[in-house]
Amino acid sequence: MSKSESPKEPEQLRKLFIGGLSFETTDESLRSHFEQWGTLTDCVVMRDPNTKRSRGFGFVTYATVEKVDAAMNARPHKVDGRVVEPKRAVSREDSQRPGAHLTVKKIFVGGIKEDTEEHHLRDYFEQYGKIEVIEIMTDRGSGKKRGFAFVTFDDHNSVDKIVIQKYHTVNGHNCEVRKALSKQEMASASSSQRGRSGSGNFGGGRGGGFGGNDNFGRGGNFSGRGGFGGSRGGGGYGGSGDGYNGFGNDGSNFGGGGSYNDFGNYNNQSSNFGPMKGGNFGGRSLGPYGGGGQYFAKPRNQGGYGGSSSSSSYGSGRRF
């Protein structure tokens, strides 16, 4: 049986969200364009279940990850005379995380060991794309490494590829990788989700299940004071000064009173690092870091797909 007939790579890694579609685009015209870069195992334009009108986005699934990379490397794409925005599709589970659908070029890397140097990070992450900046964070007073870093790429596609994969090993140790978001981006993400502005790129099942809450995760909205604590935790993550809220506040703590300086063992009082499921950072479940949080970084230009062609409801909980 051929590789295309029996794909061995996870479907989620082979799927692209295509935003900004013309309302005239059909499954056939979408397929005709994207199959230029490889065999498609699925292709669908999402439509309103009642009116059958296009919702302005769709999904294409390739037979192999290699073909997904080829299509992304061929950007920009124009379908039926309109420039569209392809992005790596986000699973339903991951789509609940704050900022999951924002377009960013920077990642947070947590749980790195004290002997990890810039070249270790570069050696591992350069397989995903061109790296612009690597910043290993240190304590301003002692100069001791704080156990986390930021890596900035020249293309959001590199970040999307990285965060889809659950496990990353740097310098022989597992680490936690998330999109790095500014407080402004977090507020924007929360606002757009509550307003149903069509900023998502969900991708579960055939066409994606568009489930979710009005807020990201389960801990309420993340735009307010102490906004990153989750519903079960005490300290907020990057709220009003307690949390890590950017490079201008290097002496700050990661929420509930303890600084993140044990290189993977965040073991201080009540801060809840994961707004998704409440595990403490360094925690007892859900892998080494417990939850599904995002991490604040230096503000940058905001991105994300929220185009006018996709104004109908995301997050309704129905499957199409």
Swiss-Prot record:
Modified positions (N-acetylmethionine) in chain numbering: 1
Positions where N6-acetyllysine occurs in the chain: 3, 298
Residues carrying Omega-N-methylarginine: 194, 206, 218, 225, 232, 284, 300, 318
GO MF entry, a single one: miRNA binding
Assigned GO CC terms: catalytic step 2 spliceosome; cytoplasm; nucleus; ribonucleoprotein complex
Glycyl lysine isopeptide (Lys-Gly) (interchain with G-Cter in SUMO2) crosslink residues: 3, 8, 78, 179, 183, 298
Keyword match Nuclease: no
Domain RRM intervals: 14-97, 105-184
Entry keyword Disulfide bond: no
Crosslink feature (Glycyl lysine isopeptide (Lys-Gly) (interchain with G-Cter in SUMO)) location: 113
Residues recorded with modification Asymmetric dimethylarginine: 194, 206, 218, 225, 232
Alphabetic keyword roster: Acetylation, Cytoplasm, Isopeptide bond, Methylation, mRNA processing, mRNA splicing, mRNA transport, Nucleus, Phosphoprotein, Repeat, Ribonucleoprotein, RNA-binding, Spliceosome, Transport, Ubl conjugation
Compositional bias segments (type: Gly residues): 197-216, 277-294
Gene3D superfamilies given in the database record: 3.30.70.330
Modified sites of kind Phosphoserine: 2, 4, 6, 22, 192, 199, 285, 309-313, 316
Subcellular location: Nucleus; Cytoplasm
InterPro entries: HnRNPA1/A2_C, hnRNPA1_RRM1, Nucleotide-bd_a/b_plait_sf, RBD_domain_sf, RRM_dom
Superkingdom, natural source: Eukaryota
Oligomeric form and interacting partners: Identified in the spliceosome C complex. Identified in a IGF2BP1-dependent mRNP granule complex containing untranslated mRNAs. Interacts with SEPT6, C9orf72, KHDRBS1, UBQLN2. Interacts with PPIA/CYPA.
Function: Involved in the packaging of pre-mRNA into hnRNP particles, transport of poly(A) mRNA from the nucleus to the cytoplasm and modulation of splice site selection. Plays a role in the splicing of pyruvate kinase PKM by binding repressively to sequences flanking PKM exon 9, inhibiting exon 9 inclusion and resulting in exon 10 inclusion and production of the PKM M2 isoform. Binds to the IRES and thereby inhibits the translation of the apoptosis protease activating factor APAF1. May bind to specific miRNA hairpins.
Protein's name in the database: Heterogeneous nuclear ribonucleoprotein A1
Source organism: Macaca mulatta
The organism's taxonomic lineage, starting at the top: Eukaryota, Metazoa, Chordata, Craniata, Vertebrata
Gene this protein is translated from: HNRNPA1
